[in-house]
Amino acid sequence: MHGKNACGRSQLIFPMVTALAFMCTQASAQYRAKDTEWPSYGADLAGTHYRPLDQINASNFSDLEIAWRIKTDNFGNRPEYKLEGTPLMVKNVLYATAGSRRAVIALDAATGELLWVHGEHEGARGGAAPRQLSGRGLAYWSDGKEERIFYVTPGYRLISLNAKTGMPVASFGTGGALDLKLDDDQTIFPDLTTGEIGIQSAPVVAKDTVIVGAAFREGMTPKSMKNNKGYVRGFDVRTGKRLWIFHTIPKKDEFGYDTWLKDSSEYTGNTGVWTQITVDEQLGLVYLPVESPTSDYYGGHRPGNNLFGESLVCVDLKTGERKWHFQLVHHPLWDMDISSAPILADIVVDGKRVKAVAQPTKQGFLYVFDRVTGKPVWPIEERKVEVGSVPGEWYSPTQPFPTKPPAYSRNGVSVDDLIDFNPELREKAKAVVSKYHLGPVFTPPVASKADGPLGTLTLGTASGGTNWPGGSYDPETHIVYAYACNACVEPIGLVPAPKEVSDLRYIAGVDGREVGIMRGPGENAGADSPMPPKKAPGGGFVRLNVDDLPLIKPPYGTITAINLDEGKIVWQIAHGETPDVVRNYPAFKGMNIARTGQQTYNIGTLITKTLVIAGEGQVTTTADHPRGAILRAYDKATGKEVGAVYMPAPQSGSPMTYLVNGKQYIVVAVSGGPYSGEYIAYTLPSAGE
């Protein structure tokens, strides 16, 4: 074990050569080298999740077998049950984050053999981190001579590693590490150890700049209206020198400062970029999907439209200077932060070539812009929306609505959206929702009252539509593929905040119920964290169902194909086996219920030459397979299912693919429930097997 310092450790398991054995076969010769690798989180800097490989296709997908697998349990002092990573593959080596310590591992991409591992022991700083566990990925850089791997630790330190050995690059930062809580144009409070700021997504490397965003606690109960700010920075890839910073909450004399009334920009925080960033290196432009400001559901302490909250912002790659922006939600109140990477797409609209950027959203809207100018490709209309009545709140009277493409998932709730398998269940559902305020997208939260309404019932908010895995794009057909949760219904009620919980006037809750801190699923789960409490009160979450059945009618989860040349939906299918609770419901015996899809939000898609590939987010037990989940393949032209293979647990990280030694592999992260994290690589049987 080679020691970097008291914090970092790298171990070279086997000496690595500059290139592993390469077999020149007919299968590998037909692809360009860049098409056989996966060098970025989203396959490329455009965020396409696309590779034109077709060795695995409709005729053989169901024949896939496990080539190798690696559990992440030992990359930390406890297992993790939320493995969300998508690996990289460059020069026959697969790189991934793993385990509750967020270690970096390098594997032989063909065999899964461990080549090296690097981990950071961050002590109290890692234990207090707002985004823990293994995170979602890494970044790779090479100038043709040197090769480096970049990642951000739970404690918010940017690490540069030698890609061949896993050793820290001494010339970067201080001994290979850059403290991201410093040189951030703010003083992180209350201190550098416990100050709330971090990130779980992969950094992005474009040309010689590494770009890092910021994230905060996942829970829906802010302790204060004040928080650290989520600025975005670019650093020199060789030295770690800060090259630029973009203030997602503008400072005085900066554009957008006047959208924060009563000096609220001075103390409001969050407003980071916690998901993936995309880059057009040719244009020298970076696309930043910005989250909500402090307090997802109550904005009375931050009156105004609150730029650049919930905005897509384009900045210069060299300077970080804002080129254009579009705010998708004015004065955010619904946790509709832009949760996934913008997709860069070269399309043809009305005979004219357009360099576009397409932004999937939780609302199920796909916003499409000219990525050079920021002009919408199709009109986006400002429409009047309901204005609420929560004391002290500030409301925007209008919100932006795209005219094309149409919404690809439900947003807003009406009686027509309720479960409709039979009249009895529909009546029970109507009784449940009678206690809530219903309305279309952008219906505001309400002050919760025990005698009603308890809250506003929403679809297309925190867990709706497309979440962090994002969409995929086929650059040959100009079609976007997006998974969406079509039934992730969430009530938003507000109650006065107890002083011991928060200094906000209102926080998420239900009148008459105990109110407490609502924690995110990864909090206090990292290797340096104390064990989490067994039970914590959560006043804002109420599970809504009817006889344990989903309150909303199917389809629960969908994959949609959207033609970007025309702004039209090509096809939409239910994705995921019908849940056991539905299939085994006594009153449904003998009924022919079409596949419903699944009520989950964290599914990413992989696009190949002919297929759309996605796993399920829930486990089921059927006559066809034991308890587990299924990795499914669809004909990307029609949406017809053409193959399926078994997974022992739900897909929890987006799948990726590559070609090594003439063989195509698909790697997917699985975890959840009692099943700890595991990367599984699938490939076709070798000839003669």
Language-model segments: what does each one mean?
Residues A29-Q55, S396-K430, P521-A527:
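N-terminal pre-domain segments of enzymes
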Residues A341-V390, S671, A681-S686:
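Phosphate/diphosphate-binding loops
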Residues A67, E113-V117, M167-A170, D179, ...:
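A structural motif specific to WD40 beta-propellers
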Residues I13-T25:
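Bacterial N-terminal signal peptides
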Residues L161, G166, N228-K241, N305-E321, ...:
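Beta-propeller blade signature
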Residues I70-T86, V117-G144, T174-A202, E218, ...:
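Extracytoplasmic beta-rich repeat domains
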Residues G47-G144, I149-T174, L178-K181:
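N-terminal cofactor/phosphate-binding cores enriched in small/glycine residues
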Residues W38-G42, E80-G99, A103, A129-R157, ...:
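Repeat-blade elements of multi-bladed beta-propeller folds
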